Amino acid sequence: MSTKDIFFNPIWDVRMTDTSLRDGSHHKRHQFTKDEVGAIVAALDTAGVPVIEVTHGDGLGGSSFNYGFSKTPEQELIKLAAETAKEAKIAFLMLPGVGTKEDIKEAQNNGGSICRIATHCTEADVSIQHFGLARELGLETVGFLMMSHTIPPEKLAQQARIMADAGCQCVYVVDSAGALVLEGVRDRVAALVAELGSDAQVGFHGHENLGLGVANSVEAVRAGAKQIDGSCRRFGAGAGNAPVEALIGVFDKIGVKTGIDFFDIADAAEEVVAPAMPAECLLDRNALIMGYSGVYSSFLKHAIRQSERYGVPAHQLLHRAGQRKLIGGQEDQLIDIALEIKREQDSGATAAH
């Protein structure tokens, strides 16, 4: 697989993707309106953001009882985003088993041009047919190895090779839990760069659950990553993603070219993205527990809901989810954990953590 047909301006050192309208969907409980999406896409496009991701938080087909229903159908939002953007490319996420091949085709028909396919970091093989279809359709392809903190660099590189051989043009180290710390990112990105060579680029997607989203992204770039994700105003799951406006400020200072104007992206974050957020993404106890315990960031809202439903502490739910090594798609097990803690409370046996 060649990287020559990847959308990449030669003046860039890295290509930025803003995922406010996908990862941010978790924080907003998938309640984006067309007006919000149109305004955010226009502001990001004006600032020079080259790629904007738009989908339900859990990807194509994610609007469901298990993950939460979308206020506006995601395909309508993809179409609106593609019609609004003048320069930026519109990306969409899909998880095999949640989205389908038909969803990919519909997203392309609606103007999406970059297909990002996500699997758990040990299950790259389930993405093979989807990458094949995406390349047949002429879509650019990106692979997400989620929860990358859970396996060592050499095993992650083996999974990246599966994606690249299937047609993936850039494989991401995805720190879904915000649990990786500096050298953990560097070692994983370097392992993927060494394995993939010129066959595919390497990317990094970070979360702020330990406050390291920006620093980890810098480590990724220094280790050879060519694509970096972030969200304006940290608009994402958990404590949010690495804030794009901060990333651009830091990259400007260390000489990493992105093509994004710092002042324009700061304006977009403050004046357009922030008003669309239900609240700021906080580095609070719940978020810290997720980073510390290695919990998938989108579990936060689900844990809060079960906490309120069963009268048990959300941070205890999240800590036990980490102990059980739950992954994306197992959100329903938070109910079992809540009932377990409730029984312990009733018997007076609940531990402090």
From Swiss-Prot:
Q: GO terms for molecular function, please?
A: 2-isopropylmalate synthase activity; 4-hydroxy-2-oxovalerate aldolase activity; manganese ion binding
Binding-site residues for substrate, renumbered to this chain: 22-23, 176, 205, 296
Does the keyword section mention Metal-binding?
yes
Coiled-coil regions listed in the entry: none
Q: Does the keyword Cytoplasm apply?
A: no
- Per the Swiss-Prot or TrEMBL record, the active site comprises 26 (proton acceptor)
Name the site position(s) for Transition state stabilizer: 22
Q: SUPFAM superfamilies recorded for this chain?
A: Aldolase, post-HMGL domain-like
Alphabetical keyword list: Aromatic hydrocarbons catabolism, Lyase, Manganese, Metal-binding
Q: Where are the transmembrane segments?
A: none
- Domain (Pyruvate carboxyltransferase): give its ranges: 14-266
The residues the record assigns to binding Mn(2+) are: 23, 205, 207
Q: Name one GO biological process term.
A: L-leucine biosynthetic process
PROSITE patterns, from UniProt? PYR_CT
Reaction catalysed by this chain? (S)-4-hydroxy-2-oxopentanoate = acetaldehyde + pyruvate
The top EC class is: lyase
EC code = 4.1.3.39
Q: Report the domain of life of the source organism.
A: Bacteria
HAMAP family xref list: HOA
What family, per the record?
A: Belongs to the 4-hydroxy-2-oxovalerate aldolase family.
Name of the molecule in the record: 4-hydroxy-2-oxovalerate aldolase 2
